[in-house]
């Protein structure tokens, strides 16, 4: 029998168990006051019965190929066992339902345990990703020196530049990739930072409620647009406009430039910066604003001298998180900035980023024992550490320098 069907049946039985426990507790309440409300008695009966059967199904699925290889065609055995466990658990739980039974405490403990498991699972997944990337990166650094990777200025995995280099597979200097990444991120933040902050100030301090109810959702809609759409916009509109404008003034501009990618990426990040800044500004106590206005300060002076200083740690933290978002962007850079590893600070030239090269290295049928493919994991490791540091700095700034108001 299909696992999905078994789980659906267990779910339906759990619903029936809930109403069974609910009816019994309602009957008991007629004679004596219950410790917990009837809904908790139904919930504990449904949770205990269903959870026991679901755990059995999970264990069976995980180990059936190794422990029960001859039973692969006999899922009916699993169905019978799960139903038996369900009714057995339901029977003993049903007997415990009495007036003094602390069903609410049991349900709360189960919910707390479930939340703990979810939190631990998220942490374990992150640790697992980090360890897997470290393992593959270590294989890469066995072939390519770490110093060459971190400080080399030539990136060309497909082109051998010297015979004694690992398998003559090319150059693995990652400096051009990180330079391009930070160049595009810097351009993006020059757009997203001021515009996002100014829009947040307008929405929180100047806009009326009716205007805010219209403008804020429209601004946040930008965050839901797929990045490939932004990429098309960069290729079709922004890049040709920059190239034609540069030609008009006698400036040589590449058809794919860091400026085009950075401008469009900045537009994409504006809702992110605006939303965080708006929340931080609204968190400033109204008493501070009223006090500033009460001593004769204008609204603009209140914003400049009271609101912004009070909200500054949160704003800086939000900007650093936006930088992490910009560093991790891929699609816009692929379409608008190109894939050539060019070490330059000229925004009119084509550059590439770490995320783009990770995609390039892993596209197609690749051998995972070659330095070319393993370089993607090394790039991912450095990018992971970089964004982790930025996120930590952002949280540290918010927590350490946030002013506490009574």
Predicted regions mapped to residue ranges:
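C-terminal transmembrane helix and the adjacent membrane-cytosol boundary/short C-terminal tail
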Residues: 279-282, 286, 293, 320, ...
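Membrane-cytosol interface at the C-terminal ends of specific transmembrane alpha-helices
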Residues: 189-191, 202, 209, 252-294, ...
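Transmembrane-helix boundary motif in ABC transporter permease subunits
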Residues: 98-104, 187-219, 394-400
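Interhelical loop and adjacent transmembrane-helix boundary motif
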Residues: 333-384
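Membrane-interfacial helix termini and adjacent extracytoplasmic/periplasmic loops
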Residues: 135-175, 230-266, 338
């Amino acid at each position: 029998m299909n696992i999905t069907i078994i789980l659906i049946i267990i779910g339906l039985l759990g619903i029936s168990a809930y109403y069974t426990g609910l009816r019994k507790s309602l009957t008991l309440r007629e004679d004596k006051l219950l410790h917990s409300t009837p809904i908790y008695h139904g919930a504990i009966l449904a949770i205990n019965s269903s959870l026991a059967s679901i755990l059995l199904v999970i264990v069976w699925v995980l180990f059936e190929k190794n422990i029960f290889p001859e039973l692969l065609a006999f899922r009916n055995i699993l169905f019978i066992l799960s139903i038996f466990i369900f009714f057995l658990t339901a029977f003993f739980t049903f007997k415990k339902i009495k007036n003094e039974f602390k069903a609410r405490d049991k349900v709360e403990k189960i919910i707390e345990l479930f939340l703990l498991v979810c939190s631990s699972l998220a942490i374990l997944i992150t640790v697992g990703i980090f360890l897997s990337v470290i393992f593959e990166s270590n294989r890469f650094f066995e072939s390519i020196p770490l110093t060459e990777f971190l400080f080399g200025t030539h990136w060309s995995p497909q082109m051998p530049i010297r015979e004694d280099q690992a398998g003559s597979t090319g150059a693995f200097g990652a400096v051009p990739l990180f330079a391009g990444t930070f160049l595009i991120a810097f351009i993006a933040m020059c757009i997203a930072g001021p515009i996002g902050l100014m829009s947040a100030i307008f929405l929180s301090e100047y806009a009326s409620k009716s205007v805010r109810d219209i403008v804020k959702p429209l601004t946040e809609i930008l965050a839901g647009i797929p990045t490939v759409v932004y990429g098309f916009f960069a290729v079709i509109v922004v890049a040709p406009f920059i190239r034609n404008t540069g030609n008009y003034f006698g400036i040589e501009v590449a058809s794919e430039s860091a400026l085009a990618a950075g401008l469009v990426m900045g537009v994409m990040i504006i809702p992110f910066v605006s939303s965080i800044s708006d929340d931080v500004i609204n968190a400033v106590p109204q008493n501070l604003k009223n006090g500033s206005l009460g001593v004769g300060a204008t609204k603009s002076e209140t914003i400049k001298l009271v609101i912004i200083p009070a909200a500054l740690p949160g704003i800086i933290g939000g900007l650093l998180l936006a930088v992490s978002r910009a560093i991790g962007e891929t699609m816009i850079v692929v379409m608008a900035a190109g894939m050539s590893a060019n070490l330059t600070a000229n925004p009119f030239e084509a550059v590439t980023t770490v995320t783009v090269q990770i995609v390039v290295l892993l596209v197609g049928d690749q051998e995972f024992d070659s330095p070319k493919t393993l370089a993607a994991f090394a790039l991912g490791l450095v990018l992971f550490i970089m964004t982790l540091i930025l996120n930590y700095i952002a949280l540290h700034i918010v927590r350490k320098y946030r002013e506490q108001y009574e």
